């Protein structure tokens, strides 16, 4: 029988929470139900939302609820069809292990990473700024691999990631976690 095709935009390839589509495709789960997925990876929820809103894809996965609700409130033709996570405990912000930055309150004038404009990480960084009265410089850095490179090379002071990304660097004491997404009261 012919498979129905769905084109998905999925943010942050390799994160645990964004692997469901790819794992399901490889395991034949979607095929068993008459579906074939075409998966397009983005650098974050902002790009995922843009792809879905423009009609470039059928579904945006891990699109960031705060950004989606904001887009909906502005009249974008979006609908939430399922929750991926509750809260933002899967996201974390980190520094190089030898950084003098010990907490978010030490980030004055420092660069504070988020993935893309309109993403959950952007919303959380914005919430950090307001909640803690920070004077950091929010900076879009894309996905976790590029962000880590920027942190380790000194281009960015505070990076962001989601497991499993960065766990090796954490175990090897190359990086140190400063905050979780749940440290933003709005999330």
Say what each PLM segment does:
Residues 14-41, 70-74, 123-130, 169:
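Short, polar/charged alpha-helical segment
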Residues 6-26, 43-45, 64-65, 117-120:
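Extracytoplasmic "Venus flytrap"
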Residues 39-50, 63-66, 137-155, 162-164:
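Short helix-initiation/N-cap motifs at beta->coil->alpha
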Residues 3-4, 70-81, 168-183:
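Ligand-binding "clamshell"
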Residues 145-187:
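Pocket-lining segment of extracytoplasmic ligand-binding domains
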Residues 51-53, 71, 107, 150-152:
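Hydrophobic residues within well-ordered alpha-helices
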Residues 96-111:
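Flexible hinge/capping segments at coil-to-helix
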Residues 3-17, 35-41, 109-113, 137-139:
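Short, well-ordered beta-strand elements
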């Amino acid at each position: 029988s012919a498979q129905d095709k769905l084109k998905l935009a999925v943010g942050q390839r390799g994160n645990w929470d964004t692997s469901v589509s790819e794992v399901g495709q490889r395991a034949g789960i979607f095929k068993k139900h008459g579906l074939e997925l075409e998966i397009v990876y983005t650098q974050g929820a902002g790009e995922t939302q843009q792809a879905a809103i423009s009609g470039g894809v059928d579904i945006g996965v891990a699109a960031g609820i705060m950004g989606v609700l904001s887009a909906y409130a502005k009249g974008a033709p979006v609908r939430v069809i399922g929750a991926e996570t509750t809260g933002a405990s899967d996201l974390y912000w980190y520094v190089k292990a030898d950084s003098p930055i010990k907490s978010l309150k030490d980030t004055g004038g420092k660069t504070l990473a988020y993935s893309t404009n309109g993403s959950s990480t952007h919303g959380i960084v914005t919430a950090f700024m307001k909640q803690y009265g920070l004077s950091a410089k929010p900076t879009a850095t894309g996905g976790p691999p590029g962000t880590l490179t920027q942190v380790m090379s000194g281009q960015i002071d505070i990076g962001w990631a989601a497991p499993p990304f960065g766990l090796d660097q954490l175990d090897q004491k190359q990086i140190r976690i400063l905050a979780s997404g749940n440290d933003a009261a709005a999330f």
